[in-house]
UniProtKB/Swiss-Prot annotation:
Pfam families linked: Lactamase_B
Gene giving rise to this polypeptide: FDB1
Domain of life: Eukaryota
Identification of the protein by name: Gamma-lactamase FDB1
GO BP term, pick one: secondary metabolite biosynthetic process
Entry EC no(s): 3.1.1.-
Keywords: Hydrolase, Metal-binding, Zinc
First-level EC class: hydrolase
């Protein structure tokens, strides 16, 4: 048994306050998008990005109700996407992308009995077309919340700025709020700059720059005892292969559930190690593209991903990035709540699902070895080397399939 490096402590203030989180399938679907615009180097089987987009409904309850107790994080692609700015629509058609949108988030909420007047704010993780939707489908009383630098770096929008990719109608006639990560509500969570949105530790916005000006993620406390958190990633990563495997979450010798088949129990991790660009079981498959592509600053995007890697090392933090379609079939989608994700094992069941996007060099090995009963790479509780008071979850090689992660100390994760 060889130990794996312990992750740095990710300290989150203790709180008994939570928010209800709902993962919304926005019905947006994009295909034929070159993966090289987002990640490098390419891995066999993942040459194009074909993905949907998630939004989130956030509901907060407290003794002092506020306008923002009900919010939506991201909106996916607007249904009438050809009404996006002319320069963007022309570029999409020239590149040969395919975009399909069945409905919009406002309609999804309304069809499930949600009064849109109760939605106090829309939070944009960032201003790209597959996240901004159409805020005009919400009442003008719904505020629009954006990340730092938005007003200076993105405004004015189209059509005032003819080359803009953002419709300025999104914020016209409604309150536009830009988050300040240096203000009174600011703190650090791990290496993220954070903003305690409600002031009670239930919902934090995270500064995660690099992909776009003002990019933000969020950390929602989904249960208080034991503490669990869902990290709403936005586009902090476009594929889970950008933050897995890692020194804290290495590629296991046997992967279960099998990402290549629903009929075999597991498959050997070496199938994917064979196509790993660096043949390193402790390094992510991808880096964000640094050259021409969709990232505003690729180096800064990599720094945000490195912070995500540290958070992902903890089993009570569940990153949900906007385009991770491998979650479908495991997680509950709106109108069902997602707060019980940890007790239901969603992270464990989906951790390596992204490997199913790849084409191993020798898939016949799956049939020969896919039903091996010894599963390695389960979790074990160890004290942090940096601070013995901090309980860390680390990955250990083990033949004990019943060994599970114990619960975290309520003050730390």
């Amino acid at each position: 048994m060889s130990s794996i490096r312990l992750p740095p402590p990710v300290v989150i203030p203790e709180s008994q306050s939570t928010v209800d989180v709902y993962i919304i399938d926005t019905t947006s679907y994009m295909s034929m998008v070159p993966a090289s615009s987002f990640v490098e180097p390419l891995v066999s089987g993942f040459e194009t990005l074909n993905a949907g987009s998630y939004a989130f409904l956030i509901e907060h309850t407290s003794s002092k109700p506020s306008k923002h107790d009900t919010m939506v994080f991201d909106l996916g692609v607007r249904k009438d996407w050809e009404h996006l700015p002319d320069t963007f629509v022309a570029a999409v058609k020239e590149e040969g992308w395919s975009i399909d949108v069945q409905t919009d988030v406002a309609s999804i909420l309304r069809d499930n009995g949600q009064d849109l007047k109760s939605v106090g704010a829309i939070i944009w993780s960032h201003w790209h077309f597959d996240h901004v939707g159409d805020p005009q489908t919400f009442p003008s009383s719904t505020d629009l919340i954006v990340g730092p630098g938005f007003k200076q770096g993105v405004m004015p929008g189209w059509p005032t700025a003819k080359d803009s990719h953002v419709n300025e109608t999104a914020w016209q006639g409604r309150k536009l709020i830009e988050i300040d990560f240096s203000g009174e509500a600011a703190l650090d969570i791990g290496r993220f700059q954070a903003y305690d949105f409600y002031g009670d530790g239930s919902f934090y916005l995270l500064n995660s720059p690099g992909h776009a000006v003002g990019h933000m993620s969020a950390l929602a406390r989904t249960t208080a005892d034991p503490p669990s958190f869902m990290l709403l990633g936005g586009d902090i990563a476009h594929h889970c292969g950008e933050f897995r495997p890692s020194p804290y979450t290495p590629l296991p010798n046997m992967i279960t559930p099998n990402p290549l088949s629903n009929t075999l129990l597991a498959c050997p991790g070496r199938l994917f190690l064979s196509i790993h660009p660096w043949k390193d079981p402790e390094r992510p498959f991808f880096d964000p593209t640094v050259g021409p592509g969709w990232h505003d600053e690729g180096v800064l995007a990599k720094d945000s991903i490195d912070k995500l890697i540290e958070a992902d090392a903890y089993d009570n933090i569940f990153p949900v990035v906007a385009h991770d379609m491998t979650l479908v079939g495991t997680v509950d989608l709106y109108p069902n709540k997602a707060n019980n994700w940890m007790s239901r094992g969603w992270k464990e069941d989906t951790r390596w699902g992204f490997c199913g996007d790849f084409t191993p060099l020798d898939e016949e090995m799956v049939a020969r070895n896919g039903q091996v009963e010894v599963l390695e790479g389960h979790h074990e509780v160890r004290d942090s080397a940096q601070d013995p008071k901090v309980t860390s979850i680390v990955h250990m090689e083990s033949t004990d399939v019943d060994k599970k992660a114990k619960l975290h100390d309520p003050s730390f994760v």
